[in-house]
């Protein structure tokens, strides 16, 4: 996490650079786009009342005018993240590059409803433009490491080896798929509205879909910004200002009233990049934290060699021997 925050801090432009990149006209144009999305939603007016004040021989009336439909605190936070994400100047994925990421995950099963088991994983991936992914996965407690290729053959030495013809989707986006998504909140909402499924409510399904896109780290800056703008329109989404290793962050959450589970996504307030996701339910809790996310031109030779020396679907001990079942 520290390495990722350091990279994000380095990547973030200075205030002088931001002012140069974001002229008053450009900032106003983006704000106008956000307000257009907000204004398109049905307003919920709150009407004031007339209060009669009687004093001696005179009667006066105080009328409270109809209140403006102001954005919620969550919507304000999310639109701020959208502005930040749109101005992010880090490297952007394109054909010929790889997304290199490191992450850790912890699942804790309930001691009351389950066996209380704890599962830890460390993952390192290299994802190509078309979705071909090299995955190194480790279990620190069990002491094993595996080397698998997702959506592609093990011809690692051939950088042009094609990915398998597995269709990408909003649930499993490739960089190529993400680049073609709508880059406005209205467009994203329209695209997802008829596609999301499998949840206890449409709002929860939309939240999960938008968070899944954001946490993939495959979205171009404008599309990531549109994702936050879209989340600002989903009923039930909450935000909380938190700190991660001393740095300001925003926790974006949604509670499923039917199951009681709570999903959260933690976003770096300075860059708009996703740091972690978490799901809490009565059965278990699951947290996945991204510790490194960067765009690289190629896979290191040592990694290519490691995949050439290890077989698919085999777990290896620290000494490099296959584990016995």
Residue spans for each PLM region:
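N-terminal export/targeting signals for secretion/compartment entry
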Residues: 1-80
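Intrinsically disordered, low-complexity prosegments and terminal tails associated
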Residues: 52-325
């Amino acid at each position: 996490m520290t390495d990722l925050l350091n990279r994000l801090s380095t990547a973030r432009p200075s205030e002088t650079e931001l002012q140069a990149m974001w002229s008053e006209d450009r900032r106003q144009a983006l704000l106008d786009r956000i307000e257009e999305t907000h204004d398109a939603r049905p307003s919920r007016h709150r009407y004031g009342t007339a209060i009669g004040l009687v004093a001696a021989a005179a009667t006066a009336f105080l009328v409270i005018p109809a209140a403006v439909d102001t954005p919620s605190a969550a919507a304000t936070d999310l639109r701020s993240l959208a502005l930040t994400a749109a101005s992010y100047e880090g490297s952007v994925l394109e054909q010929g590059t790889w997304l290199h990421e490191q992450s850790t995950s912890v699942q804790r099963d309930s001691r009351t409803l389950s066996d209380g088991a704890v599962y830890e994983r460390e993952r390192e991936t290299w994802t190509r433009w078309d979705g071909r992914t090299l995955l190194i996965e480790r279990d620190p407690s069990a002491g094993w490491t595996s080397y698998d290729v997702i959506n592609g053959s093990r011809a690692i030495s051939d950088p042009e080896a094609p990915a398998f013809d597995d269709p990408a989707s909003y649930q499993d986006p490739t960089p190529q798929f993400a680049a073609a998504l709508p880059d406005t909140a209205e467009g994203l909402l329209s695209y997802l509205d008829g596609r999301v499924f499998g949840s206890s409510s449409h709002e929860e399904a939309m939240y999960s879909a938008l968070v899944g896109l954001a946490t993939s780290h495959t979205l171009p800056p404008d599309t990531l910004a549109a994702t936050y703008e879209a989340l600002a329109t989903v009923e039930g989404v909450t935000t909380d200002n938190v700190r991660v290793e001393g740095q300001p962050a925003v926790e974006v959450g949604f509670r499923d009233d039917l199951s009681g589970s709570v999903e959260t996504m933690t976003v770096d307030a300075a860059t708009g990049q996703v740091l972690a996701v978490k799901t809490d339910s009565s059965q278990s809790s699951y947290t996945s934290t991204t510790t490194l996310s960067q765009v690289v031109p190629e896979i290191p030779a040592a990694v290519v060699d490691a995949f050439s020396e290890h077989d698919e679907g085999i777990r290896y001990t620290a000494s490099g021997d296959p584990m016995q079942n």
